[in-house]
Amino acid sequence: MGENDPPAVEAPFSFRSLFGLDDLKISPVAPDADAVAAQILSLLPLKFFPIIVIGIIALILALAIGLGIHFDCSGKYRCRSSFKCIELIARCDGVSDCKDGEDEYRCVRVGGQNAVLQVFTAASWKTMCSDDWKGHYANVACAQLGFPSYVSSDNLRVSSLEGQFREEFVSIDHLLPDDKVTALHHSVYVREGCASGHVVTLQCTACGHRRGYSSRIVGGNMSLLSQWPWQASLQFQGYHLCGGSVITPLWIITAAHCVYDLYLPKSWTIQVGLVSLLDNPAPSHLVEKIVYHSKYKPKRLGNDIALMKLAGPLTFNEMIQPVCLPNSEENFPDGKVCWTSGWGATEDGAGDASPVLNHAAVPLISNKICNHRDVYGGIISPSMLCAGYLTGGVDSCQGDSGGPLVCQERRLWKLVGATSFGIGCAEVNKPGVYTRVTSFLDWIHEQMERDLKT
């Protein structure tokens, strides 16, 4: 009813009106058709009400059972593009069972502290033995991760592996001609152990290096040129809006909330290799494609991750370098001191972005502590992480959205988080909240692999 409509007169309740039977039109078939029609109408509710009720209950039960079947894929793989469930054995088997062939992606990964190569086959992840491994197979593996080339492939003793990486193994089928090895999950066979006692490690890109380091950034320090060479300024119609992280010559990681509703590539430019946003000589790079996570939840900021593809590749130098992605199953302990950077406001409430790049050291905080009722009260999901000080004073702020949270491991800087949200800036019991990159490695690599194939 519209605001200007007269108030409706309340009609006495009847099952006829409830089920729309008052609207039935019955053609007369006898001289006393009007009386017959009236009689039929009076009988319909009583006659059909039990049937209608039973029908509705059956429909509800059918829907519930159907949804239960579709969404409860226990022990199976659920296609993201539909409600279809397939057996795990059908994933990465060379046959596209899901729409758009999604079950034939995410079939290769690099895992653990040692960057061990694993292949998904026969319903589980299995570690690649170095037996029958040839160096040029690394190109195939890296292509399945979305990288156009590789840097190095080495071997590591099985005894040096973390427990989950020495349970199941595969090797390349040595009977296959080299030109037939175009996808690792089509080219391996399962084995109980590695005869050589060694497995394959893989590095697809030279990353995570910088020239030294010297507290966002509220409580932060001004950064030096080349100190955070993967830092990107994402500019919407010429104005800095968010931060990002360079991971390849073509790809930038940022937050989905930065690009949601602002997803036209031509409206964006990227600048890298700079500290000052004012009078800087750094060229602007055009954006070709923007992809944000399909399950991004604006109200809860879940799945807050996006990728930008540049129209042309970056040229790496001392001022521009990619940061490493972490490996699958790689853990970063609570309390580990990591670093966040960006052009965010340096004072809470200041509003404007800082004209110069700042950085701050922030310790990682467990999700258990971050979900305490006095902190974020249970809204932090496993795909998020917190970093900062519960006492306040140092944090990432507006303008740092999408920017990097990096940790150093074995002399390499790794992208552990992308700045997502927080309450205020550097407030007590309100540390910064970041998208946990390890939770989205499969998604990142799938987007890059799909693009590489086009």
Curated annotation (Swiss-Prot):
The record marks 216-217 as: Cleavage. Keywords: Autocatalytic cleavage, Deafness, Disease variant, Disulfide bond, Endoplasmic reticulum, Glycoprotein, Hydrolase, Membrane, Non-syndromic deafness, Protease, Serine protease, Signal-anchor, Transmembrane, Transmembrane helix, Zymogen. Changing residue 103 to G: In DFNB8; fails to undergo proteolytic cleavage and is unable to activate ENaC. Pfam families: Ldl_recept_a, SRCR_2, Trypsin. Changing residue 401 to A: Fails to undergo proteolytic cleavage and is unable to activate ENaC. It is a single-pass type II membrane protein. Undergoes autoproteolytic activation. The active site is at residues 257, 304, 401. The keyword Glycoprotein applies. It is found in: Endoplasmic reticulum membrane. Residues 217-449 form the Peptidase S1 domain. Changing residue 407 to R: In DFNB8; fails to undergo proteolytic cleavage and is unable to activate ENaC. Residues 70-454 are extracellular. SMART domains: LDLa (SM00192), SR (SM00202), Tryp_SPc (SM00020). Its main location: endoplasmic reticulum. The chain crosses the membrane at residues 49-69. Residues 72-108 form the LDL-receptor class A domain. Expressed in many tissues including fetal cochlea. Isoform T is found at increased levels in some carcinomas. Glycans are attached at residue 221. GO terms for cellular component: endoplasmic reticulum; endoplasmic reticulum membrane; membrane; neuronal cell body. Residues 1-48 are cytoplasmic. The keyword Zinc does not apply. It is linked to Deafness, autosomal recessive, 8: A form of non-syndromic sensorineural hearing loss. Sensorineural deafness results from damage to the neural receptors of the inner ear, the nerve pathways to the brain, or the area of the brain that receives sound information. Probable serine protease that plays a role in hearing. Acts as a permissive factor for cochlear hair cell survival and activation at the onset of hearing and is required for saccular hair cell survival. Activates ENaC (in vitro). This is Transmembrane protease serine 3. It comes from Homo sapiens.
